[in-house]
UniProtKB/Swiss-Prot annotation:
The keyword Oxidoreductase applies. It catalyses: N(6)-[(R)-lipoyl]-L-lysyl-[protein] + 3-methyl-2-oxobutanoate + H(+) = N(6)-[(R)-S(8)-2-methylpropanoyldihydrolipoyl]-L-lysyl-[protein] + CO2. The branched-chain alpha-keto dehydrogenase complex catalyzes the overall conversion of alpha-keto acids to acyl-CoA and CO(2). It contains multiple copies of three enzymatic components: branched-chain alpha-keto acid decarboxylase (E1), lipoamide acyltransferase (E2) and lipoamide dehydrogenase (E3). Keywords: Oxidoreductase, Thiamine pyrophosphate. Heterodimer of an alpha and a beta chain. It is an enzyme of class 1 (oxidoreductase). Its cofactor is thiamine diphosphate. One of its GO terms (molecular function) is 3-methyl-2-oxobutanoate dehydrogenase (2-methylpropanoyl-transferring) activity. It holds the Pfam family Transketolase_C. It comes from the Bacteria. One of its GO terms (biological process) is branched-chain amino acid catabolic process. CDD domains: TPP_PYR_E1-PDHc-beta_like. This is 2-oxoisovalerate dehydrogenase subunit beta.
């Protein structure tokens, strides 16, 4: 998968990295480049994070730059808002995206609104990292994908990478950005490529093939989608883990699908979406989160508004079920290639 127009400082060596390693590299680089960057959250210091994304950073930069926080998501986000308003660039980790709800008031009423409320006198340049989605059989309290909750909040950016290269470049771009950012990290992709079919554990000690990632500083532009698979028959709008499911579905059906990895969910790269749908005349939207009021509903609305006269078939949406994320039946909940491929065939039959 190719990032669009990556901003490299100069030519540099590359290393095979998992997404965890790429995220750690991004934080390492930014801690070294900018003394205003601080990293904190539950267990991110001495322990290195529950998924080891921050492993070794406290030892390298000290307890004043990388430190643990109490089990209080509201307190973590509230502290980050204050730090950002007074000149720091906090990078905080919410241990699981499912845990963020107690911090909703701090995120929505404070972080997202402070620039507006102060007429631009204060900014909140903080990045909130959150592991999301399934992949660890964590059940309803360790598997949610709450992106739709954040994309409707004016003043927040919402980002979700699908590969190590984008994860590093996007995280660096988010940390340098002056807006508060929700940075969602699909757990199923933490430790290696996902073929769309077979579940794999994401424990830090599991070894899987990784991707080639530049060792040094680079940025992937925010608000730009990536066409990861060009095609002419139909457009697939997706992000995160579902990028790989869409690719598997295209391979299995043999259809010439154009797969777009949104990467930045909000602000959205509407230009790329509209150009693709007008070209293909058909659109399938796929995400892991629940269906009702999910982000796919907004995507459907935008495609309908901007591409109505170019559509050759009704828009299809493939999502998780409108139930809590199950424990033992995780794979039955997850929208796999069979369901996505069936949607491909339906839009082609019209």
């Amino acid at each position: 998968m190719n990032a669009m127009n990556p901003q490299h400082e100069n030519a540099q060596t590359v290393t095979s990295m998992t997404m965890i390693q790429a995220l750690r590299s991004a934080m390492d680089i930014m801690l070294e480049r900018d003394d205003d960057v601080v990293v904190f959250g539950q267990d991110v210091g001495y322990f290195g994070g529950v998924f080891r994304c921050t492993e070794g950073l406290q030892k390298k930069y000290g307890t004043s730059r990388v430190f643990d926080a109490p089990i209080s998501e509201s307190g973590i986000i509230g502290a980050a808002v204050g730090m950002g308003a007074y000149g720091l660039r906090p990078v905080v980790e919410i241990q699981f995206a499912d845990y963020v709800y107690p911090a909703s008031d701090q995120l929505i009423s404070e972080a997202a609104r402070l620039r507006y409320r102060s007429a631009g006198d204060f900014i909140v340049p903080m990045t909130v990292r959150m592991p999301c989605g399934g992949g660890i059989y964590g059940g309803q309290t360790h598997s949610q994908s709450p992106e739709a909750m954040f994309t409707q909040v004016c003043g927040l950016r919402t980002v979700m990478p699908s590969n190590p290269y984008d994860a590093k470049g996007l995280l660096i771009a988010c940390i340098e950005n002056d807006d508060p950012v929700i940075f969602l990290e699909p757990k199923r992709l933490y430790n290696g490529p996902f073929d769309g079919h077979h579940d794999r554990p994401v424990t830090p000690w599991s070894k899987h093939p990784a991707s080639q990632v530049p060792d040094g500083y680079y940025k992937v532009p925010l608000d730009k989608a990536a066409i990861v698979r060009p095609g002419a028959a139909l457009t697939v709008l997706t992000y995160g883990t579902m990028v790989y499911v869409a690719q598997a579905a295209a391979d299995e059906t043999g259809l010439d699908a154009e797969i777009i990895d949104l990467r930045s969910l909000w602000p959205l790269d509407l230009e790329t979406i509209v150009a693709s749908v007008k070209k293909t005349g058909r659109c399938v939207i796929a995400h892991e989160a629940t269906r009702t009021c999910g982000f796919g509903a907004e995507l459907m609305s935008l495609v309908q508004e901007h591409c109505f006269h170019h559509l050759e078939a009704p828009i299809e949406r493939v999502t998780g079920w409108d139930t809590p994320y199950p424990h033992a039946q995780e794979w039955a909940y997850f929208p796999g290639p069979a369901r996505v491929g069936a949607a491909f065939k339906r839009v082609m039959e019209v």
